[in-house]
Amino acid sequence: MNDKPKYYITTPIYYPSAKLHIGHTYCTSIADSMARFKRLDGYDVFFLTGSDEHGQKIEQKAEEAGVTPIEYTDKIVGMFQQLWKELNISNDDFIRTTQKRHEKVVQMLFQRSYDKGDIYKGKYEGWYCVPCESFWPENKLDENHTCPDCGRPLQRVSEEAYFFKMSKYADRWMKYVEENPGFIQPESRRNEMIQFVKSGLEDLCVSRTSFSWGIKVPFDPKHVVYVWFDALVNYLTAAGIVDDSEKFKKFWPADVHLVGKEIVRFHTIIWPIMLMSLGIELPKMVYGHGWLIVDGEKMSKSKGNVVDPIPLLQEFGSDAIRYYLLNDIQLGQDGNFSRDRLIGRINSDLSNDLGNLLYRSLSMVEKYRKGVLTKGDASSDETVAAASKEIEDKAAETLSAFRAGMNGWKINDALKAVWTFVRALNKYVDVTMPWALAKDEAKAPLLDAVLYHLCEGMRFVSLMAEPVIPIASEKIWNQLGLTDFKNADYKDLVWGGIADGTHINKGPQLFPRIEIEKDEEAPVPKKVEKKQPKKEEKKEEKKEAISIDDFFKTDLRVAEILTAEKVEKSKKLIKMTVSLGDGETRTVVSGISEYYQPEELIGKHVIFVSNLKPAKLMGIESQGMILAASKDGSLKVPFVDMPAGSRVK
């Protein structure tokens, strides 16, 4: 044990009735990013995930497959663990409810609650959902008797069972939730749970006799413990409640249980009431995240829209998947999964903004300084000095904003802060123009300062982005010529950390650009409208020759795209605001929406016809034209590495 503050975070333990889908990947990526962040922020972290392996559904699945339940779960749990490895999940423990350590804890706590008088024998007659492993009282159902959580038909069951006195603790639960408003998050989930309890809390069936795959009730072995009393206890088992009292003393209570919104009820009502009965401190927070949806619908096998993460990981890599999920989905809300948006995000944020910044920064260090960094001196040039001071200030401000976002469970806000800084570094290149400084030996200290600021800024980015893109972050760190990445933390993020004389190690592009065109076997299922085959393009006729004087009438400039958005009711048009330097901006409308996502254009430098007469397109005045090349139905915009306003000759 050490003196660091502790942080205990858990995912749900996933049910091995089938392969995991992208929604499970989302949940575990969130938890992993928080665990990594807390480690970098100086905490002793215990990060738990696992598998919930008992219950009637598993028993039935195993029987259908002609194997024993443990043989059935062993195979699928192995797939879980392989997925987490490929996703680069940094869990400290993986608990299985079939492990002996867990069986011992469940039986001990069941006995304790029984001895207290909070568990009694009775007969259960009512409605049961096999897939969800949940009982439903009549007052929570509609006339169709379908599961309120999953929508499947419920089974009417009648059997001897043990019951847990949930109703006894309803008032105490309500008082606790009112006095601890941060216990259930986000607030919308808290309000839902309060209304659920206000509508009436019935005692909970906590044992079954109609199947045998489960942990035996210690004083009545013909009963097995109901799966939720079994599963929820895993958080105590892994924390060492029986086997490691020092560990348990340090890490319990859990700081956060991260769960999908469909199991918030079990974690925020059943679980805390169980702990009240057992005399164990409640977790500090339960956070219920939203669902990932595809084509506007929740994923389900019956709809054929379940997204398998394995092909995506193989095609795009874990960092790209993690970044997209955590950046594009507002935590706590449902979010739509889109392959096109994933590719757009890779191209715009990871390839263009981050990857190109690192590559061109290190290329200039290699070209102008033979790969060696020196801090230099920017004081001799007012523009460079001011821009450099702004980067130093923004680095500290970004770290503060990033930490605030992560601590506030606003991961996408934290990432936006980091990528705003990345774009500021890209802008810094345009303002300071290191290629121009390199032409004048007298400006060598200025060039050194600019190159150092770019690399030191990337050092900040590397550590801040590590919770979300850990593989790329370590590559950035190593390419900057730094070592001991595993032991770095946020205390190291003080400006000036790269020592004079550091040799950079430029590598290949971090995130190669992905072409938008997709094959028919794309791993993300979606509804696709059949397109008519394209008509063969006619060979273009040669244009009439023009004089050199006519050509020079065209004023071609480099323009930086500041904003970009699709034009409403148009499939082809994107509206952009571009900068021509010296504070001059223009609005331009371009027919490139079929080939580029708006977000991947922002920050790009393009060739712009600046003296074209304005024309209205879809009611928007377009004040120029962006040049593009087309052939055989494809189109590409040439991007250039020159400052905005540069004349094209």
Labelled PLM ranges:
Residues I476-D550:
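Intrinsic disorder at enzyme termini
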Residues K123-E125, L141-N144:
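Short metal-coordination and nucleic-acid-contact micro-motifs, chiefly zinc-binding Cys/His arrays
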Residues K121, W127, D328, Q333, ...:
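Helix-rich, typically C-terminal accessory recognition domains appended to large enzymatic cores
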Residues R112, Y128, F135, T146, ...:
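The −1 position to Zn-ligating cysteines in a subset of zinc-ribbon hairpins
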Residues W136, L154:
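Cys/His-rich microdomains that often coordinate metals
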Residues N2-T49, R96, R101-V105, P131, ...:
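Structured secondary-structure scaffolds
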Residues Y72-Y128:
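A broadly conserved sequence feature marking short terminus-proximal activation segments
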Residues K530-K649:
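Phosphate-backbone binding interfaces of nucleic-acid-interacting proteins
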